Amino acid sequence: CKMVFDEMLQFRAKINSRTDIGFHPTLRNYSVHEGELWFFDTFPPMLMKQRDLNGLILKMSPYGGILKKIIPLMLINKVTDEYYRTDKMFSGIVGSCCRLRPDDADKILTFSREYVNQSVSLTGEDKKRIFRLLKKPPRLSKIWILIRKLSGNTGKPNINTPISA
């Protein structure tokens, strides 16, 4: 998790606070090669405002026309906040780590809280928001799961991909 946390904070530090650009630092979007972290993601780049990304998600959905009429774009934020908000990014990374390694969830939480506490890149307010989200292993909310399913954007685990020896 540390390498992903570091990369996420570097990303947040490099963008201008007035720039609305998304980043999805979930664990499964990374690989480690020769001690370096490599980012890969097949989702379209989030070089857009969150509202525009919400519209794109609906447009890509097989039910986009119907969903656009019944789901306010702001509700899609339940999915896309994790691409734009530092606290939600942390929660997403930690939640992903805990879901992939449930037996280590307590260790992951302890490490994550210590990382946040020691970070000089995070403001006091950032830390408070993150600590509120890391009281227990983060879980995906039912609304998050529903919106992802309805938009056809459920994600596929890539940990079962065969590795040639």
Identify the role of each PLM range.
Residues 1-24:
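Conserved kinase catalytic-core helix
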Residues 16, 29, 54, 77, ...:
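Detector for Asparagine
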Residues 17, 51-52, 101-104:
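Alpha-helix capping and helix-coil boundary motifs
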Residues 19-80:
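Catalytic activation segment of kinase domains across protein kinase-like and atypical kinase folds
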Residues 37, 93, 98-165:
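Regulatory N- and C-terminal appendages and interdomain linkers associated
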Residues 62-114:
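A conserved mid-domain beta-alpha-beta active-site/ligand-binding segment of alpha/beta enzyme cores
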